[in-house]
Amino acid sequence: MSPYKAILRPNGFTFKQFFIAHDRCAMKVGTDGVLLGAWAPVTSVKRVLDIGSGSGLIALMLAQRTSEPVQIDAVELDEEAATQAQENVAASPWAHRVHVQQADVVEWAQRCEHSYSLIVSNPPYFSPGSQCASPERTTARYTTGLTHEMLLDCAEKLIDEDGFFCVILPASAGSKLLEQALQRGWHLRFRTDIADNDTRPANRVLLALSPQPGERLLDSMTIRGPDRQYSAAHCRLTRDFYLFR
């Protein structure tokens, strides 16, 4: 058997240091989660919260990027996804640092006794309307269960004074969340606009918000270059995770 076929298992996705099984998760490993996990600022991070963790992908990426004392809590509403995330964590090198909770994050936040220096979320972004094929996928991608206002409420309750709240969203949804956040007193600190290639406008945005003002760093990135190969910027961002790079 080819070593590549042995590594690229059909029920999930193999990264350099861990494997993500996602066959029981509504949302599979995708570009958005990988970008957020590789991009979120981790300097001086003490404790991390991943809201809507799904398969546990972003939590494990952040575990790889942070040092031994850092603890990571991952909260996921769907029972099957949370169970699979727990299994993925248990099979990883960071099982002692990543803790998966199956819970509604709005209720969980009310009883949480910790604050976090980094909160990340790849949140729902479709408004109610047409529904997905499965109720689990609807929950994962439609704001009927977790609106952006509710997400900001949770982040405000749980964030450290000098912490960062990071999300990835489609460009239009990101603009709306950013407007809501600024109205509530958040400050934009980092923003990366992402285009599929250099002939198209940005269709995703990475945002890092903080309760505290500070220098703004704004940039942009394309995922693929004119030759349809991954761009140098994308390769630099994700090289610690993707195989064969």
UniProtKB/Swiss-Prot annotation:
Gene3D superfamilies given in the database record: Vaccinia Virus protein VP39 (3.40.50.150)
Keywords noted in UniProt: Cytoplasm, Methyltransferase, S-adenosyl-L-methionine, Transferase, tRNA processing
Family annotation (InterPro entries): DNA_methylase_N6_adenine_CS (IPR002052), SAM-dependent_MTases_sf (IPR029063), Small_mtfrase_dom (IPR007848), tRNA_Adenine-N(6)_MTase (IPR050210), tRNA_adenine-N6_MeTrfase (IPR022882)
A Pfam family matched in the record: MTS
Enzyme Commission identifier(s): 2.1.1.223
Catalytic activity: adenosine(37) in tRNA1(Val) + S-adenosyl-L-methionine = N(6)-methyladenosine(37) in tRNA1(Val) + S-adenosyl-L-homocysteine + H(+)
Keyword Oxidoreductase attached: no
Gene Ontology CC annotations of this record: cytoplasm
GO biological process terms held by the UniProt record: methylation; tRNA processing
GO molecular function: nucleic acid binding; tRNA (adenine-N6)-methyltransferase activity
Location in the cell: Cytoplasm
Superkingdom per UniProt: Bacteria
Claim: ATP-binding is one of the keywords in the record: no
UniProt family annotation: Belongs to the methyltransferase superfamily. tRNA (adenine-N(6)-)-methyltransferase family.
Biological role: Specifically methylates the adenine in position 37 of tRNA(1)(Val) (anticodon cmo5UAC).
PANTHER family associated with the record: TRNA1(VAL) (ADENINE(37)-N6)-METHYLTRANSFERASE (PTHR47739:SF1)
Name of the protein in its database record: tRNA1(Val) (adenine(37)-N6)-methyltransferase
Species, as recorded: Erwinia tasmaniensis (strain DSM 17950 / CFBP 7177 / CIP 109463 / NCPPB 4357 / Et1/99)
